[in-house]
Amino acid sequence: MINVAVLGYGTIGSGVVEVINRNNAVVSGNAGDEIRVKYVLDLREFEGDPVQKILVHDFNTIVSDDEVDIIVETMGGIHPAYEFTKQALEAGKNVCTSNKELVAACGYELMSTAKEHGVNFMFEASCGGGIPVIRALYNSLTGDVIEEITGIMNGTTNYILSKMDSEGADFDTVLKEAQDKGYAERNPEADIEGYDPCRKIAILSSVAYGRQMDYNDIYTEGITKITADDFKYAKKLGMRIKIFGTSSNTADGISAMVAPYMIGAENPLYGVIDVFNGIFVKGNMLGDSMFYGSGAGKLPTASAVVGDVVDMARHLHETVNRIWSPEKIELIPHENVKNSFFVRCKGTAAEMKERVTELFGDVTFIDGVIDGEFGFITGTLTEGRFAEGAKKLPEMITRIRTK
């Protein structure tokens, strides 16, 4: 029998317990031994819930129990998740987590600690909820040089942008609706300002490129400045607006960014709507591949966590997950990153054509969408070149990158 302890009985923790209990025959069969949840750690009481029988309030009860083989961390945040995880690994216990903050900040250290003690630290659910993208990068795509990762990695913001697109609603209205439905937190800052996908693209890039990407180095822009008027232009162009976490590995170096993009129907992420996530990966041999599914939610995320539990159950006394190098990735300076841009501007295309062309080169103009303004799409420019041009165009209303 393999005993599991779950740290935290919130949405994901309770989902892990449910998946293991409901699908126990399948989970245990795939693990090669019976999987049992022996403990759940939480400060709260859960009267009337069967979990009350295995509930403990002191982490030492778990870490000192030699029968506990695997610990599942679902508390979120860095502290005390970091301290509990490190202590568990040092005690020779395997740990898996859905905690992107923990992995983005401390992933290399915790994987190294796991290796030192002959156990594993896994985090499949930290980036794509139920989408098995990390295992694919670690196992299936090991023959490829990964050239690009681009993804819709946050269900909350994808829901908001999808609703703004389909209903023509403004940002604040759709955000409140998302909060009322439980898709967005009361404090939605991590989602709408892009901090959540920033950590996720940092983790995926570290896995794919084999070196540490610091999320603090990633240029990050949220969706709070996207308006219903922006979608009027997108519809005219047959495009949609999505927020991407993206990184590229080219001969010039590695770049990374989180920002809204306007994309056409030919983009494989165009059809990823509502709360779903999609992650595009390009390898130098495989070419393009797509991972699609529920990027959040109780049971989809718990399913990915339990996948790690099963993997660790098969390798209880050996370290199988690869460790990326502690060498920090020095990102291409933001001003040198290349993008194309959609721009909204006051005035008319006829009167502004010469000035716009002088500042940005050849562009495609879009007129007749909103009275008193026009739009245009640039060719590929560096961020620095575009910013210099934008300073000289006070009539500019907004800009959104295109892909």
What is the meaning of each model-derived region?
Residues 68, 115-196, 203:
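Rossmann-like NAD(P)H-binding beta-loop-alpha module
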Residues 81-87, 91, 100-138:
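Rossmann-fold NAD(P)-binding glycine/threonine-rich loop
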Residues 146-150, 158-161, 165, 177, ...:
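Catalytic, metal-anchored helix/loop core of enzyme active sites in primary metabolism
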Residues 95-96:
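A short hydrophobic/small-residue beta-strand
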Residues 7, 11, 15, 35, ...:
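Conserved active-site and cofactor/substrate-binding residues in soluble primary-metabolism enzymes
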Residues 1-91:
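N-terminal glycine-/serine-/threonine-rich beta1-alpha1-beta2 phosphate-ribose binding loop
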Residues 309-403:
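A conserved regulatory-domain signal marking ACT and ACT-like small-molecule sensing domains
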Residues 175-271, 276-278:
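Substrate-binding/catalytic subdomain of NAD(P)-dependent oxidoreductase enzymes
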